Amino acid sequence: MAQFGGEKYGGRHTDEYGNPIQQGAGAHRGGGIMGGGQQAGQHGTTGVLGHGTAGQHGTTGGGLGHGTAGTGGALGGQHRRSGSSSSSSSSESDGEGGRRKKGMKDKMKEKLPGGHGTTTDQQQYGTAATHGQAQQHEKKGIMDKIKEKLPGGQH
């Protein structure tokens, strides 16, 4: 929503979305989902999960966004947030009574279906009476397991 008078009398006071714009040499805007808002100063802003825009001294864009540096270069360290929305624990046992932080690879493995990668081979000992086919000690494929369960004879 533009104000009356337009750019002719003092410039535009809102952006294209109707948000107020600070006027002056040190006006900066920090965007993002979790805030930022309008700030004025010479040191720029930090946008959380969005992007920050810089003035004289630059900014640090944190999280998933990006920052743009001004004439003075970026100040401060970046705030890092993970993009994971997993409900699983972020640490696991290291086998010696302590705990260690899971890496990205471990978290991704946890989300994939089909087990956790630890398989053990099972063997049968002794003798057993068989009807029809002999027992095999090989792993069966998915199709073999399905065919076994279908009525109407063995395929």
UniProtKB/Swiss-Prot annotation:
Induction: By desiccation (leaves) and by abscisic acid (ABA) (leaves and callus). The keyword Isomerase does not apply. Residues 118-135 have a biased composition (Polar residues). Residues 27-39, 47-76 have a biased composition (Gly residues). Residues 1-155 are annotated as: Disordered. Residues 136-155 have a biased composition (Basic and acidic residues). Residues 83-92 have a biased composition (Low complexity). The keyword Transmembrane does not apply. One of its GO terms (biological process) is response to wounding. Signal peptide: none annotated. Keywords: Stress response. It holds the Pfam family Dehydrin. GO terms for cellular component: cytosol. PANTHER family: DEHYDRIN XERO 1 (PTHR33346:SF42), DEHYDRIN XERO 2-RELATED (PTHR33346). Belongs to the plant dehydrin family. This is Desiccation-related protein clone PCC6-19.
